[in-house]
Amino acid sequence: LARNVEIFRGEHLAHSSPERLVAQCWDLAGLDRRYAAFIARWSREFEHCNQCGMTGARAGIHKPCTAPADCFRRRFLLVHEYRAFPLEDPLLPGPLLPAGWTGKAAARLFETYHDALAGPAERFVADVCAEGDEIVAAA
């Protein structure tokens, strides 16, 4: 490991506090508002799917809101909306984040809902691909 790694230690010596430097470099309040909007939108959908049988959908019992095509659509939109956050979030340590920071809650919601939608969404893709194979074979 020592042949491939360099280790540095830095110390901020003057002119501003870490909090002030963070405020100059990132719009954390704006990012936090976008995280909160993401949570508001997707937590309602996640709860709705849980109430109407998301766990049943994972077991193969599809209710209207958890049909494979709908799960694929929801998962696609969820990923599309969330994917900008990892590029924008500086992943600062807790003491440098605003009080009530919603970034971690948004990440947990994304991971939980994304995983819950996986089974039915992936079945939908497999079914569509199989149908395409049948069409090609018949041509």
Write out the residue ranges for each language-model feature.
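Long, contiguous binding/interaction regions
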Residues: 1-139
